[in-house]
Amino acid sequence: MRLRGRGPRAAPSSSSGAGDARRLAPPGRNPFVHELRLSALQKAQVAFMTLTLFPIRLLFAAFMMLLAWPFALVASLGPPDKEPEQPLALWRKVVDFLLKAIMRTMWFAGGFHRVAVKGRQALPTEAAILTLAPHSSYFDAIPVTMTMSSIVMKAESRDIPIWGTLIRYIRPVFVSRSDQDSRRKTVEEIKRRAQSNGKWPQIMIFPEGTCTNRTCLITFKPGAFIPGVPVQPVVLRYPNKLDTITWTWQGPGALKILWLTLCQFQNQVEIEFLPVYCPSEEEKRNPALYASNVRRVMAKALGVSVTDYTFEDCQLALAEGQLRLPADTCLLEFARLVRGLGLKPENLEKDLDKYSESARMKRGEKIRLPEFAAYLEVPVSDALEDMFSLFDESGGGEIDLREYVVALSVVCRPSQTLATIQLAFKMYGSPEDGSIDEADLSCILKTALGISELTVTDLFQAIDQEERGRITFDDFCGFAEMYPDFAEDYLYPDQTHSDSCAQTPPAPTPNGFCIDFSPEHSDFGRKNSCKKVD
């Protein structure tokens, strides 16, 4: 399985004239991975700063947060859902000014000596919602503290000592993960505030919903666009020579990012307020279109591509299982195309056995694009051709249907490695005893990992203790139970990456979530929100 190069296809623009003129090809880099490499000189600088300026900066930043706490406490007293008085009382204006000054001093102490601001922030009556992108770090809180705008936060955040008080001051929209109706209530609250004619503070939302490495803009969630009111796009840049800012799912952990950032002589950040985007009538009726068109405007300002990767792809990339997906896996692209065809992985899981039986009956017989379309019960389209090309390694216009089923199984249940392998054995196994040879195992694992080349000889020989030249699922399962880290020992050291990211190393241990300012969130990975193994 490989990601064959295909140029960007033309996509129809919306009738409003604001749609994407072209759907750009997927980025070469996985947007959920960040690799940080320090030169010898940079390592020496970090060592020097760790012993000198780092502890001073850390203590001073903590002191400034403590200094801000009593002001925020007094100003946040009272019912949180009560409409702010208009105009603001003089004492609240003073508190607001003091808190902004304290927060700016805190960032200055952390090395953010100059925060470049371009454009003009719109008034609340002009744009009640500010959409910020790309979302790449907890340092994205800088524009929040500079404007004291409201944000969307998890309800649990208000119980954090000191930080919770500071959060309550900006009157955030709290999302409760224990309330099944939370998403609807959140959107309704955003809509209520957005339509208050400037009575509430502006709401800052990161529509990507998770952190990326800023190489592209992933799919925007529609929560900020459902109210159908004008929004002001805001783009963030960190033009530093060494990127110690980015905090993604795979890469340096939160504490390491903080340490390395505070060990830089100075850190730069640029905040650009773009012109207010007023939705057309069509966009008001279609929040997804509205979100897509705003993303296009922001991507153009940033000079980056857009991709249809989503927050759910992040879950796929970081799913815990015995087969860890490499950073350059093609399965993210496969998952994107599955959704592009209108197929939902969560609904397809129950049909995997039916798909696998149909593929097994083919016994490796190759099929062409029209047959593939009939198998999926979808018309031939650009998205289907792109998906077909993922499995057409030779470029001969034919694919093995079994590979599609294996890839689909990984996307539908990314954490259930053995279930996918068992399904593959049923399709590839001999009719007599269900055994497979080394070539079959290589094909199964390459597809399950979404890569084009993989050496499985050592793994196959380790499983095939009797040297029969064939193994069964029971053999594989028994070996996996005895050596749960078999992939680390037998696959990844010799893994050759696909053409799409030839120089990308194996992905390190995943991080947890960045602070999510988007109204739509997931429970995935919360148990690992602070876990990091270096």
Swiss-Prot record:
Binding, Ca(2+): D392, S394, E398, E403
Protein name (Swiss-Prot/TrEMBL): Lysophosphatidylcholine acyltransferase 1
Catalysed reaction equations from the record: a 1-acyl-sn-glycero-3-phosphocholine + an acyl-CoA = a 1,2-diacyl-sn-glycero-3-phosphocholine + CoA; a 1-O-alkyl-sn-glycero-3-phosphocholine + acetyl-CoA = a 1-O-alkyl-2-acetyl-sn-glycero-3-phosphocholine + CoA; a 1-acyl-sn-glycero-3-phosphate + an acyl-CoA = a 1,2-diacyl-sn-glycero-3-phosphate + CoA; a 1-O-(1Z-alkenyl)-sn-glycero-3-phosphocholine + an acyl-CoA = a 1-O-(1Z-alkenyl)-2-acyl-sn-glycero-3-phosphocholine + CoA
Role noted for this protein: Exhibits acyltransferase activity. Exhibits acetyltransferase activity. Activity is calcium-independent. Catalyzes the conversion of lysophosphatidylcholine (1-acyl-sn-glycero-3-phosphocholine or LPC) into phosphatidylcholine (1,2-diacyl-sn-glycero-3-phosphocholine or PC). Catalyzes the conversion 1-acyl-sn-glycerol-3-phosphate (lysophosphatidic acid or LPA) into 1,2-diacyl-sn-glycerol-3-phosphate (phosphatidic acid or PA) by incorporating an acyl moiety at the sn-2 position of the glycerol backbone.
Intracellular or extracellular location(s): Endoplasmic reticulum membrane; Golgi apparatus membrane; Cell membrane; Lipid droplet
Chain ranges for the short sequence motif Di-lysine motif as given in the UniProt record: 531-534
One Pfam family in the UniProt entry: EF-hand_8
Cytoplasmic-side positions: 1-57
Regulation of its activity: Activity is stimulated by Mg(2+) or Mn(2+).
Record-level GO BP terms: negative regulation of phosphatidylcholine biosynthetic process; phosphatidylcholine acyl-chain remodeling; phosphatidylcholine biosynthetic process; phospholipid biosynthetic process; positive regulation of protein catabolic process; protein catabolic process; retina development in camera-type eye; surfactant homeostasis
Domain EF-hand residue range list: 379-414, 451-486
Species the sequence originates in: Rattus norvegicus (Rat)
InterPro entries the UniProt entry points to: EF-hand-dom_pair, EF_Hand_1_Ca_BS, EF_hand_dom, LPCAT1-like, Plipid/glycerol_acylTrfase
SUPFAM superfamilies per the UniProt record, alphabetical: EF-hand, Glycerol-3-phosphate (1)-acyltransferase
GO molecular function: 1-acylglycerol-3-phosphate O-acyltransferase activity; 1-acylglycerophosphocholine O-acyltransferase activity; 1-alkylglycerophosphocholine O-acetyltransferase activity; 1-alkylglycerophosphocholine O-acyltransferase activity; calcium ion binding; lysophosphatidic acid acyltransferase activity; plasmalogen synthase activity
Entry similarity comment: Belongs to the 1-acyl-sn-glycerol-3-phosphate acyltransferase family.
